[in-house]
Amino acid sequence: MRAVQAGPPLRRRHLGWWAAACGLCLSLLAGCAALDEQQRRWIFQPSDRTWAGGLAAAEGMQDVWIGFDSPASGQAVQLHGLWLPQPEPGAPVLLYLHGARWDVRGSAHRMRRMHELGFAVLGVDYRGFGRSSPALPSEALALEDAHAAWRWLAQRQPSARRFVFGHSLGGAIAVALAAEVDDEAGLLVEGSFPSIPDVVSSFRWGWLPLGPLITQRFDAGARIAAVRSPVLVVHGGQDSLIQPALGQALFEKASEPKRFVLVPGGSHHNTNALGQPQYREALAQLFGLDTLRRD
């Protein structure tokens, strides 16, 4: 009787296992890629639209275009921004980084209020927003865009004191930018958070173990200690979207000098308007900007 040769069937079986394992890995990778893409859409909600009040507030602002070659995407990028200069040559300059959903015109009212405090203001749209180059935004791409806008400001206003301002999601981008540059005069963050997992945990269903699945983490809490300039964290006392405790937690992780301002009655959207007196006081005390306009 001839012996049964087990080699080829076993080899075929091993090949089958390897094929199944490779297929599973490819499926997981595809699933991770799809999950990452959905998170980017959910977090940024990129749009070329704004609300009616934003359209009116943006009227008269100067259009600017910031071009650069993106190492992250390997493509040429054009960013659209709105520029509000000051007549005084020595005025401080503010880079405004907006949050999710609306394009930069949706933040024009905040930009004007910061302009009324004495700043020259540049607001910029990330890729995928407004008239900037089309792309699905990500944490890495948005930070790259913020760096490009910061370089534009440095070239436009080389002798001015330059500040970084971020609202909501833009606050996390502002923290990351301020942690990586060394020429900012100060960081201002309004209605922001330590990380996306922290925001998710604050929701009603936040007990679900979703943290490990979050790819777009925006870990401002881990980065803010590296910011070497003074830090102002502002939050609305009635912010129901990003809870005040999250702003306080971000503030606690920052290095001195720093200041936390809680605006009574402020929501996620009107804190900047209600908190103008607190802003003026904090800007004078923390940054020494006591010569800002008071008209």
Task: Give the residues covered by each predicted segment.
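Acidic catalytic loop of the alpha/beta-hydrolase fold
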Residues: 238-242, 269
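Hydrolase active-site cap/lid region
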Residues: 172-223, 229, 273, 277
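Alpha/beta-hydrolase fold nucleophile elbow
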Residues: 158-168
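Short alpha-helix in the alpha/beta-hydrolase fold that links the catalytic acid
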Residues: 110, 243-252
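Short beta-strand/loop motif that positions the catalytic acidic residue
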Residues: 227, 233-235, 239
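N-terminal cap/lid segment of alpha/beta-hydrolase-fold proteins
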Residues: 49-87
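Membrane-embedded segments
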Residues: 75-152
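Catalytic histidine neighborhood in serine/cysteine hydrolases
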Residues: 253-269
